[in-house]
Curated annotation (Swiss-Prot):
Homodimer. Keywords: Chloroplast, Fatty acid biosynthesis, Fatty acid metabolism, Iron, Lipid biosynthesis, Lipid metabolism, Metal-binding, Oxidoreductase, Plastid, Transit peptide. It is an enzyme of class 1 (oxidoreductase). It is found in: Plastid, Chloroplast; Plastid. Binds 2 Fe(2+) ions per subunit. This is Stearoyl-[acyl-carrier-protein] 9-desaturase, chloroplastic. It catalyses: octadecanoyl-[ACP] + 2 reduced [2Fe-2S]-[ferredoxin] + O2 + 2 H(+) = (9Z)-octadecenoyl-[ACP] + 2 oxidized [2Fe-2S]-[ferredoxin] + 2 H2O.
């Protein structure tokens, strides 16, 4: 699970909201609930009252365990199905690529020459490309959060840390495959000499410490819809960084990003198969879950990104990715359109009244998003230049 930017976050879209609890702001002075008669606090005093390691942005009050308990039996009944349809999507470790396959070999006599060649190729890449590539890598490196998120889901979590269930095996093995992505990009960026590794490492630590806010409610229906969307977003974003690396003449980096994109495509296939099976077993519950996630909008895993300086870091990163065409609002709409078609939403029958409403909402949402994006693009002005600590505070246009 990689970049998954939220191109909608910084644009004035007014999608329908779901009936959810209000937002709790953890880093804003609002959370203090001070009476109007209370004396104003200085910024240092407000900072001192914040809990350590709280996210840099507002986090929704969480809804917990929203799936009816009886539906846990659905996932227990899918154990054999998961073994035959999920675990077969995994690659044998001995046949899998490893980061070292794409990097200079430190044990070889030609190591220094190989590093020199890598750095020469990296010099041809512009700063804005590095901003997006670093953002990709940071998001990949927050993998502990994503495994944690999957293990919040009722009925499929790894209950022991080494559970033999098909669901638990999938989560651990998926994590193991994903772990190579951040490792590879991290080492490439380190060797490139183009970035401030300490600032990047701080950002990773902040992000893992902050967690993520996907609003999946311990509900595997919501969770697997979320991962289906995100894996496709990852496939698109890494595919675009591969294409642009090739355009800039770095064929080795293009191979790196393309290889990661291929992994994400395979993972997308697995997660979309789960939801497809849920539509077969429980079309009413699944279509309502899909509509619920889209009403809430898909929050991106790295949306709590922070480097210790810029609390708008994720929004700025998203703006650069949008401008470069790495991941855009159009991609968001394309993913939704793809999933609506993949899961045959229009042809669902026998739904309840609420299920029919969810179906109608989903079938009309992609055109609406496209119209809103077109209006936003028509109003869009050229963005300012802002410094990014990841590239030694060099400025990049948003």
């Amino acid at each position: 699970m990689a970049l998954k930017l939220n191109p909608l976050a910084s644009q004035p879209y007014n999608f329908p909201s779901s009936a959810r609890p209000p937002i709790s702001t953890f880093r804003s002075p609002k959370f203090l609930c001070l009476a109007s008669s209370s004396p104003a606090l200085s910024s240092k005093e407000v900072e001192s009252l914040k809990k350590p390691f709280t996210p840099p942005k507002e986090v929704h009050v969480q809804v917990l365990h929203s799936m009816p308990p009886q539906k846990i039996e659905i996932f227990k009944s899918m154990e054999d199905w998961a073994e035959q349809n999920l675990l077969t999507q995994l690659k044998d470790v001995e046949k899998s690529w490893q980061p070292q396959d794409f990097l200079p070999d430190p044990a070889s006599d030609g190591f220094e020459d190989q590093v020199r060649e890598l750095r020469e190729r990296a010099r041809e890449l512009p700063d804005d490309y590095f901003v997006v590539l670093v953002g990709d890598m940071i998001t990949e490196e927050a993998l502990p959060t994503y495994q944690t998120m999957l293990n919040t889901l009722d009925g499929v979590r790894d209950e022991t840390g080494a559970s033999p269930t098909s669901w638990a095996i999938w989560t651990r093995a998926w994590t193991a495959e994903e772990n190579r992505h951040g490792d590879l990009l991290n080492k490439y960026l380190y060797l490139s000499g183009r970035v401030d590794m300490r600032q990047i490492e701080k950002t990773i630590q902040y992000l893992i410490g902050s967690g993520m806010d996907p609003r999946t409610e311990n509900n595997p229906y919501l969770g697997f819809i979320y991962t289906s969307f995100q894996e496709r977003a990852t496939f698109i974003s890494h595919g675009n960084t591969a294409r642009q690396a090739k355009e800039h003449g770095d064929l080795k980096l293009a191979q790196i990003c393309g290889t990661i994109a291929a992994d994400e495509k395979r993972h997308e296939t697995a997660y979309t198969k789960i939801v497809e099976k849920l539509f077969e077993i429980d079309p009413d519950g699944t279509v309502m879950a899909f509509a619920d996630m889209m009403r809430k909008k898909i929050s991106m895993p790295a949306h709590l990104m922070y480097d210790g300086r810029d609390e708008s870091l994720f929004d700025n990163f998203s703006s650069v990715a949008q401008r470069l065409g790495v991941y855009t609002a159009k991609d968001y709409a394309d993913i939704l359109e793809f999933l609506v078609g993949r899961w045959k939403i229009e042809s669902l029958t026998g739904l309840s009244g609420e299920g029919n409403k969810a179906q109608e909402y989903l079938c009309g949402l992609t055109p609406r998003i496209r119209r809103l994006d077109e209006r936003a693009q028509a109003r869009a002005k050229k963005g300012p230049k802002v410094p990014f600590s990841w590239i030694h505070d060099r400025e990049v246009q948003l």
